[in-house]
UniProtKB/Swiss-Prot annotation:
The lineage of its organism: Eukaryota, Metazoa, Ecdysozoa, Arthropoda, Hexapoda. Residues 1-19 form the signal peptide. GO terms for cellular component: extracellular space. This is Defensin-2. It comes from the Eukaryota.
Length: 104
């Protein structure tokens, strides 16, 4: 019974860490917005460069910071990162400075 509970918790953790990874990048049309009249803009504000693409926010530290704990019976320090990398079809990985680094 203890093994089943630990296995269920591990499956829930793997599912939660894989759910935060975007699976598909949007390739549809991107429509331009109209230009704002520059005379209404305050001189102290900086405009964002329109040539830089907006990248999605990635939370890479969850598997290494939150899941990096060990007890007397169980330690999942680098194994959570390795499972996350295997789910991304990579060859495993490890935690470095709180960030999960996957092997190629």
């Amino acid at each position: 019974m203890k093994f089943f509970v630990l296995f269920a918790i591990l499956i829930a953790i793997v599912h939660a860490s894989c759910a935060s990874v975007p699976k598909v990048v949007y390739d549809g049309p991107i429509y331009e917005l109209r230009q704002i009249e520059e005379e209404n803009i305050e001189p102290d504000t900086e405009l964002m460069d329109s040539n830089e693409p907006l990248l999605p926010l990635r939370h890479r530290r969850v598997t290494c910071d939150v899941l990096s704990w060990q007890s007397k019976w169980l330690s999942i320090n680098h194994s959570a990162c390795a499972i996350r990398c295997l789910a991304q079809r990579r060859k495993g990985g490890s935690c470095r400075n709180g960030v999960c680094i996957c092997r190629k």
